[in-house]
Amino acid sequence: MPTVLSRMAMQLKKTAWIIPVFMVSGCSLSPAIPVIGAYYPSWFFCAIASLILTLITRRVIQRANIKLAFVGIIYTALFALYAMLFWLAFF
């Protein structure tokens, strides 16, 4: 009668082939978007959209008259957050 560890080892052997599949799933063509005959990387568009959304957020915070400490860190973090969310949502 197999023990719990041997059952886990057998199950791991059955599913071990999945690990290399996930490791090479990123080895595809670079996502590029053609704009007027030139190809631009998709991260460029995520950065532009993130910059626009960060500026809108800044304007909303200014109009609400909210005072923030560490403004540079906060807006940099918002820029990075928005860029990653755009990348996750659209690419």
From Swiss-Prot:
Its main location: membrane. It is found in: Cell membrane; Membrane. It comes from the Bacteria. Residues 1-26 form the signal peptide. It is a lipid-anchor; Multi-pass membrane protein. A lipid is attached at residue 27 (S-diacylglycerol cysteine). InterPro entries: YtcA. A lipid is attached at residue 27 (N-palmitoyl cysteine). This is Uncharacterized protein YtcA. The gene is ytcA.
